[in-house]
Amino acid sequence: MTYDTLLTEKFNKMTYGFVGLGLIGSSIAKAFRRAYKDCRIIAFNRSEHARMLALQDKVADYATDSIDEHFGECDYIFLCTPVEYNEYYLRELKSIIKPSCI
């Protein structure tokens, strides 16, 4: 088994969170879905349209308009919102995420 195969298997078993499904967030989420088809993707976005598209296109497995307990399952979380919102979302995530989450 090659290193790339081992890495792909590892990343396929992980859960990724995306806070923000704009151009950057949705692009990264789509890239993860293409590369790691069996991974789990949790997504937050205020726009219902963006959430519905992510679910419809099978980019996200779960999409919500609030930072909720599902983010506690994430191994990695990507903050893809305008910088001025990051502090707020980090505070929301702090009490939910597991200690090993990056």
PLM region spans:
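NAD(P)+-binding Rossmann beta1-loop-alpha1 motif at the extreme N-terminus of oxidoreductases
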Residues: 2-66, 72, 76
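Rossmann-like NAD(P)-binding element
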Residues: 62, 67-102
